[in-house]
């Protein structure tokens, strides 16, 4: 007598569950990195919004703005914020965004990234990456900060991973002067 088998055997179900588990184990870390990079992109967008004011100040005064007020952007720094960004601060021409300490991917909580300009060949070139500091407003030199508030490089956009080639924008000096 032949009987038709209905449904799946226990072995077949266990194989399917194992395959789903393996796929989830691979996909979850990739998804977490993706969400962290998306959250970091908000910080870069907010920081980039301050570049034109900082560049204009530099071209008009010959030195970098000391803070948000002198740059002509929102002050205090906590006024420039987003869903994932706590504040955006201008200090001696370096624009630094600080991530929130809650409501963001745990790998970037409280971490910082910087955008900074440098005068090169008659224009201002902007760089992005790990937090940097500039000792004085009239200097072009910057020093990379080595501390626990650095965002892991894997979460930065590819243009911000290498400080030597991380040019975000080049602004010619004539871009801020009106022809009269």
Swiss-Prot record:
Topology relative to the membrane: Single-pass membrane protein
Key word Disulfide bond present: yes
GO cellular component, one term: pilus
Keyword Disulfide bond among UniProt keywords: yes
Disulfide bonds: 128-160
Residues bearing carbohydrate: 70
Keyword field: Cell adhesion, Disulfide bond, Fimbrium, Glycoprotein, Membrane, Methylation, Transmembrane, Transmembrane helix
Main location: other
PROSITE patterns: PROKAR_NTER_METHYL
Cross-referenced NCBIfam families: IV_pilin_GFxxxE (TIGR02532)
Role played: Major component of the type IV pilus (T4P) that plays a role in cellular adherence, microcolony formation, resistance to neutrophil mediated killing, twitching motility as well as transformation. Mediates the attachment and the formation of bacterial microcolonies on host epithelial cells. Mechanistically, pili retractation induces host NF-kappa-B activation in infected cells, which is temporally associated with the formation of gonococcal microcolonies.
Protein known as: Type IV major pilin protein PilE1
Gene responsible for this protein: pilE1
């Amino acid at each position: 007598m032949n009987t038709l088998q209905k449904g799946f055997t226990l072995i077949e179900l266990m194989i399917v569950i194992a395959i789903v588990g393996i796929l989830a184990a691979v996909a979850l870390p990739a998804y977490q990195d993706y969400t962290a990079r998306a959250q970091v992109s908000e910080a870069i967008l907010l920081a980039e919004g301050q570049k034109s004011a900082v560049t204009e100040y530099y071209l008009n005064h010959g030195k970098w703005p000391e803070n948000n007020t002198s740059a002509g952007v929102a002050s205090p720094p906590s006024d420039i914020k987003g869903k994932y960004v706590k504040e955006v601060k201008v200090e001696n021409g370096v624009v630094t965004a600080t991530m929130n300490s809650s409501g963001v991917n745990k790998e970037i909580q409280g971490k910082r990234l910087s955008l900074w300009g440098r005068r090169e060949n008659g224009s201002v070139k902007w760089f992005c990456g790990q937090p940097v500091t500039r000792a004085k407003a009239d200097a072009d030199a910057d020093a990379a900060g080595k501390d626990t508030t650095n965002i892991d490089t894997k979460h930065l956009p590819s243009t911000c991973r290498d400080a030597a080639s991380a040019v975000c924008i080049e602004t010619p000096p004539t871009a801020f002067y009106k022809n009269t």
